[in-house]
Design a protein with these regions (language model features):
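Well-ordered alpha-helical scaffold segments within catalytic/enzyme domains
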Residues: 2-11, 55-67, 109-127, 198-217, ...
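Extended glycan-interaction surfaces of carbohydrate-active proteins
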Residues: 6, 10-48, 71-101, 148-191, ...
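Extended, well-ordered alpha-helical scaffold segments
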Residues: 15-23, 65-78, 124-143, 203, ...
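Short hydrophobic/aromatic segments of transmembrane alpha-helices and their interfaces
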Residues: 39-40, 52, 110, 134, ...
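Aromatic-rich carbohydrate-recognition surfaces in CAZymes
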Residues: 47-73, 77-164, 197
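Compositionally biased regions
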Residues: 61, 179-180, 212, 221, ...
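Calcium-binding acidic motifs and repeat modules
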Residues: 140-148, 181-182, 186-195, 199, ...
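Short, contiguous, pocket-lining structural segments
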Residues: 188-202, 218-221, 225, 254-257
Length: 300
């Protein structure tokens, strides 16, 4: 049984109270029934649950609706393909059918939040086992299908693998990719990707922590495997002179576009503190690149 949760807020400022109450009311519209399961969709016209946002969104909403918070993790685990691939998005159609969509990865804000929900929901052993199995299978899938040149960096096959709508650095890459092999006749993909490589790091990093919690003797094994991914990412995609990560195209050529994705690597933990500090110092705090008092709009 899930623990009971709730949120209350009251203040003497009538305008602030009205704003809070309206925000709570608006957010209730994002609770949707996907069959028998209540989930929290992204909102703003986005009626699916996406792997890039909604495991995180579910965790953020746990005090208000624990059931939805858990379902935002469980639906991705329950709809995982037999070969290990996790759906990039899950949609509930008007007739009530649930469609897990495997035509893109669409980011990977999942392992950390799914593990956090284990703590918040009461530390059920079966849930932890289910999460570990899911992550191990997905990691294996990634290395089976996304390192076509064997360079130790995992690849993006389409624009929506990394959720970068209209990104020019993808060239003529397709928006979606439904195959487990690279698209033919594309000029950039398969792209050695800091994002997709970090997906594996996040899986292995979380599996190391799960192993510690379960005491199954594999903590060090997963830690070493995670560190190996981070080392490959640094060796192939990090530029020491420019203090940022840069993806490589299908020919191994560096894609010379400075983008915010190194920040994503910070989130996944796939780059070191030293690398993160250098990126912040050289770019986020650099007034010659943008007006530093304001957040980078793409990052915002």
């Amino acid at each position: 049984m899930l623990p009971k949760t709730g949120v209350t807020f009251s203040c003497d400022d009538a305008a602030l109270q009205k704003l809070f109450d309206e925000a709570e009311r608006k957010c209730l519209h994002n609770l949707k029934d996907f069959g028998a399961d209540t989930v929290l969709v992204e909102g703003g016209g986005y009626e699916k649950i996406w792997l890039e946002t909604q495991p995180m969104g579910g965790e953020m909403y746990w005090k208000r609706n624990m059931t939805a918070a858990m379902n935002n993790q469980l639906l991705f685990m329950r709809t995982q393909r037999a070969d290990g691939r996790i759906a990039g998005s899950i949609q509930c159609h008007p007739d009530g059918t649930i469609e897990p969509q495997f035509n893109k990865f669409q980011g990977f804000c999942f392992p950390l939040h799914a593990l956090n929900m284990w703590y918040l929901s009461g530390k059920e052993p079966a849930y932890l086992d289910m999460l570990a199995d899911c992550l191990e299978k997905f990691d294996a899938y990634l290395w089976k299908t996304r390192d076509s040149d064997g360079d130790g960096c995992l690849e993006s096959f389409c624009v929506y693998d990394t959720g970068e709508d209209n990104a020019l650095r993808y060239g003529h890459a397709p928006v979606y990719c439904t195959t487990d092999t690279p698209p033919e006749d594309a000029d950039v993909v398969p792209m050695a990707s800091m994002d997709v490589t970090s997906f594996s790091y996040a899986c292995r990093d979380t599996l190391s922590e799960i192993s510690r919690l379960r005491g199954d003797g594999r903590e060090s094994e997963w830690r070493e495997k995670a560190d190996a991914v981070a080392a490959n990412l640094k060796a192939r995609l990090w530029d020491d002179k420019r203090h940022a990560c840069f993806d490589r195209d299908k020919h191994g050529k560096t894609i010379d576009v400075l983008c915010h994705n190194t920040l994503r690597c910070m989130y996944w933990g796939s780059i070191s503190q030293e690398m993160a500090d250098a990126f912040v110092r050289q770019h986020l705090l650099n007034p010659q690149e943008f007006w530093t008092p304001l957040a980078v709009l793409s990052d915002k």
